[in-house]
C-alpha cells in the first residue's frame, strides 16, 4: 500500500460531489446495553443514598426516577413496585417534615425535578402533592417573577443568568402541572397561571450568556410555546456549540461534559430531532465512549467553573450520569 499525493483541483460545474461522511452511528442494541448498565448504577446509587442519608436531594433520587420512567416507556424491564415506592417516598419527603411537623418542600429544584420526572404519566402519589407544590412555587417566587435555588450553581458575577436558568426549569415544571387541569383544584390552576405570567415577564428580553444549559432551556421553552417563539434560532445556536467530540460543555468553549450532553440530547429530541440526526448521533457516540465500566460517567461539579475546580464526587457523578442516561434513552423508540 502506498500513499497518494494530495491534489487540489477545482470541481467542474455539474460534477458529482461526494456527500460528507456520516458520523459514526451506534445501534439500538448498543444504546440499550449502555442505558441498562447506567440504570443499574442509578438504582444502586440512589438506594444507598436513601438508606445512608435518608434524603432525596436535587441530584440523587429525582434523576433516578426520571430515568426509570423514560426506560419504562421504552420497553425496559423496570421493577414497578420499587419505582412506585421510591416515587411515593420522594414526593412525601418533599411535602412533609415529620420531625418538625410541617411542610417543607426541600430545595426548590428538588420539587421541580420531581415534577419533571413524571412528565406525561404522573403517579397518584405525585398528583396528590401537586397542589402543595403550586403553593410552594408561589411562596418561593421572587418579586421580579424569578426563582432562585437555595444551593444555587452559578458562574462568578452571573447571578442573573443563574436566576434565569432556575426560572426556566421552574416554568417547565409549571407547564407540566398545567397539563393536569382536570385533576387539580381551581385555585391551584389560578395560582399556576399567575406564577407563569410573572415568570414570563422576568424572562422577557433575556439574553444568552456563557452557560450551555441556559441556551438548551431557552430552546425547549420556545419549542413548548415560550414567550418568544424563536425555536429555530435557539436550536441552531445549540447545535453550533456542539464540540468536535460530540458533547457539549457547561460553558461555551469548555470541554464536553456527560451532564450537559445529556441535557442537550433531551432538548434536541424533545424538539423533534430523530435518532439519525447527525448531532444526536455524535452525542450518543460521545456518551458511549465516556461511560465507565460500572455504568456511570465521571462528571465534575458545575462549581468547577467557579470556586471548586477539582470537585468530583458521588453526587456530581450520579447527577451527570442521570442526565446522560436520560439523553441516551430519549434516542430509543418507545414501546
Language-model segments: residues:
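Preference for long, amphipathic alpha-helical scaffolds in soluble/luminal domains
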Residues: 10-335
